[in-house]
């Protein structure tokens, strides 16, 4: 069971670049979305949020369905949903931003140099020597997905998860195969935290959420669900939907690799506008002091 299947069982989040703004066409789009949800997804997704953006503007936001099947309370465009694999985008942006703060460092810097370890992957000399953070982002390390390791209490952030990954045996060839792997993405969590000298959640909040005005967005790992407007996750099994306990989701998301982010239709429209180049957050301003010198002190060998 992947995080994508688990978290998307409660939400289908559409972030669409659509060429319409106002008038009958927008009404037809909204009507089509409502009909598709009613006829195709209502039995699979109790709640759905939709955002449509164009030219830096939020053209349409729509909230359909309910937050949970028991209360029947309607969702809104500010209701939080688990984003599953979209969390990886936040990890990638954070790495790119932190890389820009250090001289002689980018996404092609080898993990060997970052971690000061020439045997980072015990089963592969090739990966140990040449693997980069870009290889992690592109899922081209060739490791079969092992998401259930998220439930292992010994696999925590930092050295423990890196050590577990280092002992894994590759399934595919390096840079010549695509194996989606959520666990290896936690390498990026570790890099981000060590470069930023803070928790992944604080870094994403301070350097992505706040500059983009994503005031409602949260994290499974730090959230108290009783204090926010949040949709319940459901998992389909044998034709029926079953609620997923929040504590399970919190544990499942603890590595903050591809599972951690909670956001709303309104906030994600801001994020989508940024991805499309229509929003320039404060971090795009030139660095006044210049990049810092990269040092292996941040990455003690495991």
Swiss-Prot record:
Native source organism of the sequence: Magallana gigas
Tissues where this protein is expressed: Component of the organic matrix of calcified shell layers.
PANTHER family with a match to the protein in the record: BETA-LACTAMASE-RELATED DOMAIN-CONTAINING PROTEIN, D-ALANYL-D-ALANINE-CARBOXYPEPTIDASE/ENDOPEPTIDASE AMPH
Protein name: Gigasin-6
Signal sequence residues: 1-22
GO cellular component terms attached to this protein's record: membrane
UniProt superkingdom: Eukaryota
Pfam families: Beta-lactamase
Primary location recorded for the protein, binned into one broad class: membrane
């Amino acid at each position: 069971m992947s995080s994508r299947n688990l978290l998307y069982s409660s939400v289908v989040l559409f972030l669409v670049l659509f060429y319409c703004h106002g008038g009958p066409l927008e009404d037809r789009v909204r009507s089509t979305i409502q009909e598709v949800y009613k006829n195709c997804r209502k039995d699979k997704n109790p709640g759905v949020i939709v955002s449509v953006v164009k030219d830096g503007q939020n053209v349409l936001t729509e909230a359909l369905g309910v937050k949970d099947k028991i209360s029947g309370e309607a969702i809104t465009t500010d209701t939080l949903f688990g984003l599953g694999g979209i969390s990886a985008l936040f990890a990638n942006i954070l790495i790119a931003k932190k890389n820009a703060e250090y001289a002689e460092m980018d996404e092609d810097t080898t993990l060997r140099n970052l971690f000061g370890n020439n045997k980072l992957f015990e089963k592969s000399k090739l990966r140990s020597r040449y693997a980069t953070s870009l290889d992690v982002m592109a899922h081209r390390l060739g490791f079969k997905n092992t998401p259930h390791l998220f439930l292992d209490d010994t696999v925590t952030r930092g050295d423990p998860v890196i050590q577990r990954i280092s002992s894994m045996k590759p399934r595919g060839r390096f840079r010549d195969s695509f194996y989606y792997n959520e666990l290896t993405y936690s390498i990026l969590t570790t890099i981000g935290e060590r470069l930023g000298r803070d928790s992944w959640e604080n870094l994403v909040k301070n350097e992505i959420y706040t500059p983009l005005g994503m005031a409602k967005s949260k994290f499974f790992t730090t959230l108290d669900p009783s204090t926010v407007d949040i949709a319940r996750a459901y998992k389909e099994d044998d034709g029926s939907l079953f609620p997923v306990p929040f504590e399970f989701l919190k544990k499942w998301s603890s590595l903050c690799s591809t599972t951690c982010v909670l956001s709303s239709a309104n906030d994600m429209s801001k994020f989508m506008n940024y991805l499309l180049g229509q929003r320039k957050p404060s971090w795009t301003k030139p660095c006044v002091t210049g990049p810092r010198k990269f040092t292996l002190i941040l990455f003690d060998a495991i």
